[in-house]
Amino acid sequence: MKKMFVLGAMLVALVAFQPAESFAQKKGKWVTLFDGKSFDGWKKWKGGEITKWAIEDGAMVLTEKGGGDLLTVNQYGDFELELEWKISEGGNSGVMYHVQEGEKYCCPYSTGPEIQVLDDAKHPDSFAGKDGNHKSGSLYDMLPPNDLKAVKPAGEWNKMRLVIKNGKGESWLNGKKVVDFPTKGPEWDAMVANSKFKGWNGFGTSDKGHIAIQDHGDKVWYRNIRIREL
């Protein structure tokens, strides 16, 4: 009995002293969202053939304006998303989550909150908004990144990580957590009310939806896209 008690105490101590991690610590299996060879698992916003998006060296590339936003075929609730992005000089794009479809919505950002992808140095949107909340890694028009130097310049690859779990979100950029944010509740409602999205019916109200990649008219690359549900 004494030995069992000692063993139990040791196990409790080991658990208590496990290192702290992101709240995405307990995870499911990683699933590749883009195989680098085809657009399997993706579709065009409002339907139709995927054009003006190409695949080059294992990356999906918006080659010219008019390709339209791309959505995952599947929908996700709580998840961890990882990808790499590279923006052209003066370019703009973004990644949205919990996107809803429907004729009443003009575009994915009508419903899906956006993590900004931008040439912070040269795109004018970088200098708009408030306190940097239009810069790369920001929760667009709501919360700025806490480190404006985390982003790499246009033409270089950046690594994004987005975690959504239990009403909370994290935006990571190149290994640094740059934004913590609620995804629901009074604090979220206040953030929306103080943003351009005030009064947008359906914006940020869903607990599940598509992942979307934005065509903002500028050349942009995405690769190594994977997700796991939490």
Predicted regions located by residue number:
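Bacterial Sec-dependent N-terminal signal peptides
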Residues: 1-25
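Carbohydrate-interacting regions of secretory-pathway proteins
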Residues: 22-230
